[in-house]
Amino acid sequence: MLDKVIIANRGEIALRVLRACRELGIKTVAVHSTADANLKHVLLADESVCIGPPLSAKSYLNMPSIIAAAELTDAAAIHPGYGFLSENADFAERVEQSGFVFIGPKAETIRMMGDKVSAIRIMKEAGVPCVPGSGAPLGLDNDENLRIAKEIGYPVIIKASGGGGGRGMRVVHNAAALLHSINVTRSEALAAFGNDQVYMEKFLEKPRHIEFQVLADHHGNVIHLGERDCSMQRRHQKVIEEAPAPGITSEQREMMGERVVEACRKVGYRSAGTLEFLYQDGEFYFIEMNTRIQVEHPVTELITGIDLVKAQLMIAEIGRAHV
């Protein structure tokens, strides 16, 4: 029984989780840094616990402090929101090992989908179309990497396996720049993500960015809630989301929806998630999966009438959501 939930985040998403909990009759505990003691979600929560100083590394990214807050307040579950520890498999694992419910996917699923190379392999096995690419991390053999790029066809894009949020990517237009770009991306990936593995894909020059929202319970039941168009971006960061996506036919929506549902079943997914695609010349190409609630989730809520955060809570509590 989820009688009390730790909200391990701040700002808008913390208020969003608090509202869903309140409407379901679930008590809330806001964890916060010393700088955030007077934020609205802290003042509105049933309880609050200070977990550290303003620096995120010592508060909102401090796993022991968050778990200790759950123990101190006798909470049943932890909702990570988005950002911070929401896609940290180690955190999800530690939460469950400590006897609490992690409101999100299983740790192994987060780990599996967080590695872009692993995620692409799984999607291919599930019949989801992917961008033509290396299909595996690039090795140190320069001749082999040049061969792979030639086979794919320039321009190509070098991506960090552990990257995300529009970071860890470099477009290469010719063979002369390839090897230097691979080395620079490796170094940046190691510094930013602690993982220097990179892979290569065909660079689509004029794609749209389309993402499909999914919900999955503990019993293998998966539904998709249609797509959002997030093509309007600046520096690979989304600026505007629109749903339904203009120009996507009902046949395309149903076809891709079936594929993403099957892919989620294949990996044993649970909770809310989003599969992201590039769309060009009438074709979809998988690029990554977000194993959390997204900033943009209200766009889907407005066109479906489904409260995604409530659904997350119900899935965590009883294993399924009534939507």
Predicted features, each with a name:
Residues 1-275, 279-297, 303:
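N-terminal beta-alpha lobe that positions the nucleotide/phosphoryl donor
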Residues 305-308:
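Acidic/proline- and glycine-rich, intrinsically disordered low-complexity segments
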Residues 315-316:
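A short N-terminal helical cap/helix-turn-helix that marks the beginning
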